């Protein structure tokens, strides 16, 4: 689980710190606040920055999963636009990658600006971008990116260990592509309330299946809701 930009908006009963405490109480929860990596006096930005290491039965590290809080809005709240992964979070992430030196995945809510950059290049026929699956379904090919200077993706490219990025945020986007050695993927959506009229839209609805094979290869596939709902469930 990672936080998005709506979890603690005006009128919310809990802030992220309080929600994190609730989520961490689950019997099988692996979620943690991830705030005090350096010290309680100087916590890194956001709530829920942590790593889940997938290992084999001998304890060998197979795949690190890095979860990050991409935060909510800038200092002016809604009027300042979307926030982003902050520099201290980026530095922390690169530290964790360097400690492990194993190809890793990152999960966070809001897409990096380079996702839009790659899409625009792909439309112009730039072969440095490799299309994998999905589409941009948002009106006017919208990407809900921050207006703050980007840095996370560039640092990840320079680092070399982050190979897969997964995000959400833009409910109708399902695009997956490879750019500068990193595969960026929008997860499919399951909401029926996010946008006006979204309950009647279906192309974006479903799940994203991530499979790590025994040889280390990763498969990422769309699982539309129509493929998992039987005719009996639909009442046919």
In which residue ranges do the predicted regions lie?
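Extended active-site neighborhood of metal-dependent phosphoesterases/phosphodiesterases
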Residues: 1-100, 192, 205-211
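Short linear motifs in intrinsically disordered
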Residues: 38-43, 164-166, 198-201
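Short, electropositive alpha-helical surface patch
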Residues: 17-29, 123-127, 174-188
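Short aromatic-enriched loop/helix-cap "lid" or pocket-rim segments at secondary-structure transitions
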Residues: 11-16, 116-121, 198, 233-235
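Structural recognition of the beta-strand scaffold that forms the well-ordered cores
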Residues: 1-3, 8-10, 51, 64-68, ...
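Active-site environment of divalent metal-dependent phosphoester hydrolases
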Residues: 3-13, 73-76, 110-117, 150-153, ...
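His/acidic metal-ligating clusters that form di-metal
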Residues: 64-67, 79-170
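Binuclear metal-dependent phosphoesterase catalytic core
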Residues: 51-59, 152-159, 171-236
